[in-house]
């Protein structure tokens, strides 16, 4: 039996991409899974696909009341909450400082930080009492942009660096009751969109990047799928497999940190 059997897991942005892969994986692990999802169509799809195995709540991660409504439903359904996974986010499609008008930069900053940083903070606030009671955990999705430049423009990169600070501070404030960690995936097959303020709300990340372009820059030389990143979340959520980690950010970058100066990887001819 899985360590996560009957564990109560709350994931934001579970309707597509990494969020959907996490929903699938935790259901496979036997967990009771809930998600807060902005899109009504995706909520309906989740309910149709997973039935009683999913509690799908329509709501916005920038709204504390929506979080609280979801947590109330989770506690009614499961009687507890064991793990909160803050995952919903938006990307800036590499919008640069020089080429982005000042007014757009300002409005884009507020929209992107509201989702990528405030959304995590509000989720932590809503979930903290239940997680303190269960001595559970929080896990936040980062990005390779939390470590390196060029994984987005200054707005996205700054938001992911802000999230690392949030993880460390929450890990400090909530210890010893709650473990707080992060996972930073690299580029993957996803429907990640951009801010409306930048005119990117209908533009998917895969319209800016190609599988070949992503694979070429990774030393492991493959195009990751969302399911490839779910393992670290499962490990961090497990009390048996993770008693000791808090304030830790797992850099799941397919080897970006070991790219060579002359070649992406030295073993390409092996």
From Swiss-Prot:
Catalytic reaction annotation: 3-(cis-5,6-dihydroxycyclohexa-1,3-dien-1-yl)propanoate + NAD(+) = 3-(2,3-dihydroxyphenyl)propanoate + NADH + H(+); (2E)-3-(cis-5,6-dihydroxycyclohexa-1,3-dien-1-yl)prop-2-enoate + NAD(+) = (2E)-3-(2,3-dihydroxyphenyl)prop-2-enoate + NADH + H(+)
- In the UniProt record, does the keyword NAD occur? yes
Question: What is the official name of this protein in its record?
Answer: 3-phenylpropionate-dihydrodiol/cinnamic acid-dihydrodiol dehydrogenase
| Role, per record | Converts 3-phenylpropionate-dihydrodiol (PP-dihydrodiol) and cinnamic acid-dihydrodiol (CI-dihydrodiol) into 3-(2,3-dihydroxylphenyl)propanoic acid (DHPP) and 2,3-dihydroxicinnamic acid (DHCI), respectively.
Q: Which GO terms describe its molecular function?
A: 2,3-dihydroxy-2,3-dihydro-phenylpropionate dehydrogenase activity
Which gene name does the record give? hcaB
- Catalytic positions? 156 (proton acceptor)
Domain of life of the organism encoding this protein: Bacteria
Which terms under GO biological process does the entry name?
Answer: 3-phenylpropionate catabolic process
Q: Which parts of the sequence bind substrate?
A: 143
Q: Does the keyword Cytoplasm apply?
A: no
PROSITE patterns, alphabetized? ADH_SHORT
Q: Which InterPro entries match?
A: BphB-like_SDR, Dihydrodiol_DH_HcaB, NAD(P)-bd_dom_sf, Sc_DH/Rdtase_CS, SDR_fam
Q: Quote the record's binding site residues for NAD(+).
A: 10-34
Task: State which Enzyme Commission number(s) the record gives.
Answer: 1.3.1.87
Q: Which family does it belong to?
A: Belongs to the short-chain dehydrogenases/reductases (SDR) family.
Q: In which pathway does it act?
A: Aromatic compound metabolism; 3-phenylpropanoate degradation
| Bilayer-crossing regions | none
Q: Which leading EC class covers this enzyme?
A: oxidoreductase
Which one Pfam family would you cite for this protein?
A: adh_short
| Keywords linked to the UniProt accession | Aromatic hydrocarbons catabolism, NAD, Oxidoreductase
């Amino acid at each position: 039996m899985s360590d996560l059997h009957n564990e109560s897991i709350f994931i934001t942005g579970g309707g597509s991409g990494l969020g959907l892969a996490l929903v699938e994986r935790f259901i496979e692990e036997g967990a009771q899974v809930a998600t807060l999802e902005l899109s009504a169509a995706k909520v309906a799809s989740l309910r149709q696909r997973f039935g009683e195995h999913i509690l799908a709540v329509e709501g916005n991660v920038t709204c504390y009341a929506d979080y609280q409504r979801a947590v109330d439903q989770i506690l009614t359904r499961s009687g507890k909450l064991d793990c909160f996974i803050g995952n919903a986010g938006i990307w800036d499609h590499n919008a640069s400082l020089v080429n982005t008008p000042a007014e757009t930069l300002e409005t884009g900053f507020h929209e992107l930080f509201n989702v990528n940083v405030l959304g995590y903070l509000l989720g932590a606030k809503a979930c903290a009492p239940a997680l303190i009671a269960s001595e559970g955990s929080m896990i936040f999705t980062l990005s390779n942009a939390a470590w390196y430049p060029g994984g987005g423009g200054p707005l996205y990169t700054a938001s992911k660096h802000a999230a690392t600070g949030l993880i460390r501070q929450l890990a400090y404030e909530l210890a010893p009751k709650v473990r707080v960690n992060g996972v930073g995936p690299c580029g993957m097959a996803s429907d990640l969109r951009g801010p409306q303020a930048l005119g990117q709300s209908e533009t998917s990340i895969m319209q800016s990047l190609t599988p070949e372009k992503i694979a070429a820059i990774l030393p492991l030389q493959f195009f990751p799928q969302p399911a490839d990143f779910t393992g670290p979340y499962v490990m961090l959520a497990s009390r048996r497999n993770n008693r000791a980690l808090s304030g830790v950010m797992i850099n799941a970058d397919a080897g970006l940190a070991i790219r060579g100066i002359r070649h992406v990887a030295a073993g390409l001819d092996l």
